[in-house]
């Protein structure tokens, strides 16, 4: 995440939006603050939405909705999701409270952007739950992109 932000920080042709643990208390500690909005031509194209301790599915989905609105307004031709499932409530490095079902709902919300979507799996350290959590997000993408399909 922080490396991705750095790559695009001065560009206006790529929008970077990130939901992640608050860097005041969570890795990487040095970047990802809400006031980091881009520089030079990229001013305003960078959005960090740090998550408070204990962020649950409802709070996460609310912020993801804000992110999706910003993405839709930007008008991209593709969305790239850096999927970190270290937001999971049992993840050993997490102080968040996202559930497996919440990850499915996140996928559904992202799919509603109705854009070609690339998903890159990044964080996640509860080795017993990573597969279920990634599968849940992908199921959400699948269901969300086909409104006639029932989960």
Annotate each PLM feature.
Residues 1-151:
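A general "terminal functional-core" signal
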């Amino acid at each position: 995440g922080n490396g991705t932000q750095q790559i695009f920080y001065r560009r206006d042709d790529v929008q970077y939006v990130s939901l992640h643990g608050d860097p005041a208390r969570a890795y990487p500690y040095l970047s990802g603050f809400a006031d980091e909005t881009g520089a030079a031509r990229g001013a305003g194209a960078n959005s960090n939405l740090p998550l408070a301790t204990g962020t649950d599915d409802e709070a996460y989905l609310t912020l993801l909705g804000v992110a999706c609105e910003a993405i839709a307004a930007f008008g991209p031709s593709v969305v790239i999701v850096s999927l970190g499932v270290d937001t999971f409530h049992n993840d050993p490095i997490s102080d968040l409270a996202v559930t497996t079902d919440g990850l499915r709902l996140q996928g559904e919300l992202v799919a509603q952007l109705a854009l070609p979507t690339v998903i890159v799996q990044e964080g996640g350290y509860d080795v017993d739950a990573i597969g279920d959590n990634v599968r849940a997000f992908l199921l959400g993408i699948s269901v969300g992109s086909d409104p006639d399909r029932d989960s």
